[in-house]
A protein has these predicted regions:
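Active-site-adjacent pocket-lining segments in enzyme domains
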Residues: 2-6, 10-11, 17, 21-35, ...
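N-terminal strand-loop element at the rim of the active site
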Residues: 40-42
Length: 185
């Protein structure tokens, strides 16, 4: 199992913390450039590799955290990479702004999805992006190989990504893990 998380300046580390902890032994951090990345929490991260060094055939799951993704909208390298992954049926998981990146690139066109902080909201300024998506009022949505989630559902998002990775022995294992994440006794 090879799981990649994508780092970009302004990403929200908390949205992927459970994924990184649970899948750490399978995890590689990738970024557009080999440089220190600063999260919205002002933590510094050094990626393991760059996108240009990653072979899409070697990726099982690619996770895009939210945060402040506006600088990624023009990242043609990321867009091309995601479309290669999608063509190969690889799992692409985006939460909050990560799902927004997927939507902006057109990756979610014709798909069931949700994202941003409180769910995708169509406005006159963004309808050219979101009108092609079947926006679902759910915290986490899986449509084929694509997983999207709203920010506050980072625990549920982590569970869905772990399900895609096949780490749970059964559904009760997933439920118990979610209860542990949320401190539900």
């Amino acid at each position: 199992m090879k799981v990649y998380v994508y780092y970009y300046d302004g990403f929200a580390e908390f949205e992927i913390a459970h994924i990184c902890c649970a899948l750490g032994k399978y995890l590689t951090a990738a970024a557009a450039e080999n440089k220190i990345i600063t999260s919205i929490e002002c933590q510094k991260f050094l990626p393991d590799t760059t996108l240009s060094e990653v072979n899409p055939d070697d990726v099982d799951i690619f996770v895009i955290p939210g945060g402040d993704p506006k600088n990624e909208y023009k990242n043609q390298q990321l867009k091309d990479f995601l479309f290669k992954l999608n063509a190969k049926g690889k799992i692409i998981a985006g939460i909050c702004g990560g799902a927004e990146i997927m939507a902006f690139y057109g990756l979610l066109d014709g798909k069931r999805a949700n994202g941003d902080s409180n769910g995708f909201v169509v406005t006159p300024r963004n309808e050219y992006i979101y009108n092609k998506i079947n926006i679902v009022n759910q915290d986490v949505v899986r449509d084929g190989n694509l997983i999207t989630a709203v920010s506050q559902a980072y625990c549920e998002f982590a569970i869905e990504v772990q399900k895609a990775a096949g780490v749970f022995v059964n559904e009760q294992d997933a439920i118990d893990t979610l209860r542990w994440y949320k401190n539900i006794k």
